[in-house]
Regions:
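Nucleic acid-binding interface residues in structured DNA/RNA-binding domains
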Residues: 1-100
Length: 100
């Protein structure tokens, strides 16, 4: 069964909007919730993620693409998102699972 691309985009963005302040989820976790793969979720975020809290979606290791790190850091500090010494998000403490 083929999925409507607009519905897929809306579903991804809806999940991103549910991530609580101070927490993050991963591209893969969103993909597990909506179907598809992490790269598809990344493509949606790249094209349509501006209006949602995009900084709450990170790689599975807690890192962001280098081009987003500087923009995300103020949000993490404001929201009290747990960070590791490396600057990546502490996924043990900050991960939010959209399937729970």
């Amino acid at each position: 069964m083929r999925r409507d691309p607009e519905d897929y985009v809306e579903h991804v963005l809806s999940i991103v909007e549910q991530v609580p302040r101070g927490q993050v989820t991963s591209y893969g976790a969103i993909a597990a919730a909506v179907g598809g793969g992490p790269r598809q979720v990344g493509a949606v975020m790249s094209r349509h993620g501006g209006p949602v809290p995009w900084w709450r979606v990170v790689r599975a290791d807690g890192s962001l693409p280098p081009s987003h790190e500087d923009g995300a850091r103020p949000h993490y500090l404001e929201e009290g998102t747990p960070l590791r010494a490396s600057g990546a998000v502490d996924m043990v403490r900050a991960f939010w699972d959209p399937l729970e």
